């Protein structure tokens, strides 16, 4: 049951019919804790990635559609890495616990920790629609005790899972009665024994704790846990709902952009996320390229945003594809809460929360595809939704592309952006960067100081659009990245 509330949750400082006036008063106070000092960003050096691991069968012909990875997410401390796939399964990896060190740092290998079936295929008999088991997103809750908790969602249903360990049991020789079906009265004679606890092989159990359903008419595209660790939001194409983790049968509708007449629909919600420290703030992005920042203290139904971030369109460059490639596929707050990172089809942008008119940084991802938009439209690749990520220190940016290529950017150093290809090679060996050129006419080799080739040309005509990196994750503390390439999970680091 979704509760639509029109009354203000908290008394607002301005009238509800004056959202623009309120928006002018909504300024980020950089003197408070959540938003760090207003610094001029210093350029940083590019990271040279090294291959660590690849999970899954690397034979391109040996996988099913259910094996395709659909989401990747590190835990808050980086000790665990969760993936979901189109078959409804969740696989959790744990960082190596053996104490092994590589080049003076703790091993950055991840091993399988737990695998379980999160969602099953369903059928909506009321609408005669099949509901896929595909996992759309996974979000970790902050660890409070020995157990871990994650939220996972498919198109309709969100589930809370508890991941716990069991490595001790009651010893078989510590019973006062024989462990048989028949009771022998003579067995009661003798001394009373106290059961003893003995070690056993580690068992990791995943148990469902809550199921949040029946609140979304359209497909859920985002979930985000609030900084208070008590509530979370879920977003579909037209609505954003607020949930309490302890309550499964009701949620509060906090954004509703559905028009009275669906023929007047001009945009849909593509992603939503809570601020990392301010529990009242959240953002949601749209298919028209705008990002809206909302404050739940203003009103319960946040249809009137506090700020809107959008870049004016150049009329000279407008085409049939302009609105499609402007659609924001992912939005992420920086760890310090000061910036927003957004990804559209061709670029990654960094927005300052204090400047709505234009991004402070724009990084091209694959501009060489601009001349191929017609072909990409015909094969539906233009609708692919790429994710983006911040590094733990907010100084680097990560996103994916086609042909299993990915790009990382050193902020403030746009000229030093490099492209790498996710492919198996020797552990801890440096990746060779790729340079995509419009045609295969030009070849160049850049040599490292050791004389090894570090860059390879790749013609844009050779790109394989069915091999793509849509889902990415960056370790919250170390320079470790995880990339989903079809059914493979690649892990790279700077060591």
Curated annotation (Swiss-Prot):
**Annotated Gene Ontology cellular component terms:** cytosol; protein phosphatase type 2A complex
Alphabetic keyword roster: Cytoplasm, Repeat, WD repeat
The places in or outside the cell where this protein is found are: Cytoplasm
Under the heading InterPro entries, the entry gives: PP2A_PR55 (IPR000009), WD40/YVTN_repeat-like_dom_sf (IPR015943), WD40_repeat_dom_sf (IPR036322), WD40_rpt (IPR001680)
Disordered, as annotated region: 1-27, 439-459
Which SUPFAM superfamilies does the record match to this protein? WD40 repeat-like (SSF50978)
The phenotype of cells or organisms lacking this gene is:
RNAi-mediated knockdown causes severe embryonic lethality. In mutants, during the first embryonic divisions, P1 cell initiates division prior to AB cell, spindles appear abnormal or collapse during anaphase and chromatin bridges and supernumerary centrosomes are often detected.
Might you name a Gene Ontology BP term for this protein?
Answer: embryo development ending in birth or egg hatching
Q: How does it assemble?
A: Part of a complex consisting of a common heterodimeric core enzyme, composed of catalytic subunit let-92 and constant regulatory subunit paa-1, that associates with a variety of regulatory subunits which confer distinct properties to the holoenzyme. Interacts with let-92.
Q: Which family does it belong to?
A: Belongs to the phosphatase 2A regulatory subunit B family.
Q: What does this protein do?
A: Probable regulatory subunit of serine/threonine phosphatase let-92. Together with let-92 and constant regulatory subunit paa-1, positively regulates centriole duplication during early embryonic cell divisions by preventing the degradation of sas-5 and kinase zyg-1. In addition, during vulva development, may play a role with phosphatase let-92 and regulatory subunit paa-1 in the induction of vulva cell precursors by positively regulating let-60/Ras-MAP kinase signaling, probably by promoting lin-45 activation.
Q: What is this protein called?
A: Serine/threonine-protein phosphatase 2A regulatory subunit sur-6
Specify the species: Caenorhabditis elegans
- Mind giving the lineage of the organism this protein is from? Eukaryota, Metazoa, Ecdysozoa, Nematoda, Chromadorea
